[in-house]
């Protein structure tokens, strides 16, 4: 994966991820959400999924830090929540939603110091 530089790179990267996860990998993404929901009440069985999620969060936080965003933890949490919302929206309600405006607005708002 190429290095993500600056807010524009973060926007492009997030858009590409949502497009991929709701396009070519849509079946896998739906299955992952089904598993998350089904295993939410079972700490032991759900641990492998939660571990993968934590690894994804750590990777996202590393990108946020590399982009130069101060206070990376809440920014990472917000980006992850936005990503989840956009993924679910595209998979269930509006598969053709133009995600770029929402991602741009969020990233620009989160990168203001």
Regions found by a protein language model. Give the residues of each.
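Hydrophobic/aromatic-rich alpha-helical bundle segments in the mid-to-C-terminal region
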Residues: 45-50, 54, 65-113
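Short amphipathic alpha-helical interaction/hinge segments
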Residues: 1, 29, 60, 87-94
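Amphipathic alpha-helical segments used for helix-helix packing
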Residues: 12, 23-46
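Generic structural signal for hydrophobic core residues of well-folded globular domains
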Residues: 21, 39-40, 86, 90-91
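Amphipathic alpha-helical segments within well-ordered protein domains
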Residues: 15-18, 36-37, 61, 65
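Hydrophobic alpha-helical connector segments
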Residues: 1-29, 76-79
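Short, solvent-exposed amphipathic helices
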Residues: 27, 31, 48-55, 59-62
